[in-house]
Amino acid sequence: MAALSLKGVRKSYGGAQYVLHGIDVDIADGEFVVLVGPSGCGKSTLLRMIAGLETVTEGEIAIGGRVVNALEPKDRDIAMVFQNYALYPHMTVAQNMGYGLKIRGVERALIDARVQAAAQILELGPLLARRPRELSGGQRQRVAMGRAIVREPSVFLFDEPLSNLDAKLRVQMRLEIQRLHARLATTSVYVTHDQIEAMTLAQRVIVMNRGYAEQIGAPVDVYEKPATTFVASFIGSPAMNLLHGRLSEDGAAFDVADGPRLPVAGSAGAGRGIAPGREWILGVRPEHMTPQPGEAFATLAVDSCELLGADNLAHGRWGAHDVAVRLPHAMRPTRGETLPVALPARHLHFFDPATGKRAG
């Protein structure tokens, strides 16, 4: 195990255009960090640079205090788990898991011992004599993880390992990865576009956008205090409602651009440095919009309602803005019905319209 450090890491492909812009992060020994963002944000490129599969244009990557920029992947003491399992079809599970050690010249007895230990951790013991075609998708991914475990690396790198699995298997594998990290406590960097994976697996999340680390923090902090409108719209399902408009002079109402005046339950700017009487992007999460007894509320004409099982999502519009409200299971408004909706000051987020950055 080892700490991982990235200092001013940048990447370009021979021109002035950078695809990664000065990434700085220190990952502690044993920490599980998730790189999350949409396609093209640079998360997989950054992971490949850590692995040594891409060169570093500028900056420094260090593993265990040793700068690895010039080292080949095999010399970095890392193990990688890919989206595609990359198993040899003619080999058994045991042979697949131990093959990396075999080509490194590790003694057969040690290979067998490590394979057996990894198989016990991943519950692969009964499958060791099978070939990949005889395995389910989840079992194949466990074999790929086992192949990484037997190397006993300083750092695990996961490149969207669950993308090929169905929804039920993804949930199961998330739990298995959590248990694996709790048991091994190996420094891990995990790439995904799925914010549910990011929120459930990470000790810290790095939200990537257009080659920048938009926000770095614990999942709960990123969710509760998004640093930018991008993070607010990307983290959370459904996304945070973002409304362009103006906060009234007394902070008691918000005038939505080309939309209604919405009463605010409490003083919106109190103690937060939110200037009244100016333009803001106001954010509020769908689960925070159900009015409490005695709170001021607005109304929303329901366009549609999604029945999700444990809860429901009502959708409508204020001006040009789509609005989603999370409701209890028993509330199922129909199209055209008017829904009371609150904007509680304690749950409001304000962003600068010019920069998209959080205020207060």
Curated annotation (Swiss-Prot):
Bilayer topology term: Peripheral membrane protein
Main location: membrane
Secreted found in the keyword field: no
Location(s), subcellular: Cell inner membrane
Binding annotation for ATP: G37, P38, S39, G40, C41, G42, K43, S44
Reactions catalysed, as given in the entry: sn-glycerol 3-phosphate(out) + ATP + H2O = sn-glycerol 3-phosphate(in) + ADP + phosphate + H(+)
Assembly and binders: The complex is composed of two ATP-binding proteins (UgpC), two transmembrane proteins (UgpA and UgpE) and a solute-binding protein (UgpB).
Stored NCBIfam families: PRK11650.1
Cited PANTHER family: MALTODEXTRIN IMPORT ATP-BINDING PROTEIN MSMX, SN-GLYCEROL-3-PHOSPHATE IMPORT ATP-BINDING PROTEIN UGPC
Name by which UniProt lists this protein: sn-glycerol-3-phosphate import ATP-binding protein UgpC
Taxonomic lineage of the native organism: Bacteria, Pseudomonadati, Pseudomonadota, Betaproteobacteria, Burkholderiales
Annotated gene: ugpC
